[in-house]
A protein has these predicted regions:
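Hydrophobic alpha-helical segments at protein termini of multi-pass membrane proteins
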Residues: 1-136
């Protein structure tokens, strides 16, 4: 269970830890999904050890990632002066991050080969999400 708790802590800390990495490697869709893949693997390993379903923990990891990332972007929101962007950002990125983490988890639960498919799917979804948001 310690591995699952570490996964939740990683989900909470990841956006801050990834900030400098994403400045040098401008591929947030790949980098963020790779970290979430590590979190999902941690949860799946814990699930196999404990023989208990941890889908709620996986969902919570996606939510914690969302909240942490959104808090980091509060500075930009304050600079724009439009404070209603924060709940909108939480709503949009919440769906993205919880959705992609659940996709990887659901496809990788039974066989680790499903993780690869889930990861590629998550990266593609994240990439097109970023393009869509940039166009708003």
């Amino acid at each position: 269970m310690i591995l699952a708790i570490l996964g939740l802590l990683l989900a909470l800390a990841s956006p801050l830890l990834l900030l400098p990495v994403e400045k040098f490697l401008p591929y947030p869709h790949f980098i963020e999904e790779a970290v979430k893949l590590v979190i999902v693997v941690m949860m799946i390993k814990t699930e196999k050890q404990t023989k208990k379903s941890l889908w709620v923990w996986v969902f919570l990891a996606g939510f914690l990632f969302t909240v942490s990332e959104s808090i980091l972007y509060l500075i930009n929101i304050f600079a724009l002066g439009n404070y209603m962007l924060f709940p909108k950002r939480l709503e949009l990125t919440g769906g993205l991050h919880t959705g992609t983490v659940m996709l990887m988890y659901l496809l990788g639960r039974k066989k680790y080969a499903g993780l690869a498919v889930g990861f590629v799917g998550a990266v593609v979804i994240h990439y097109f999400f970023n393009l869509w948001v940039a166009g708003l």
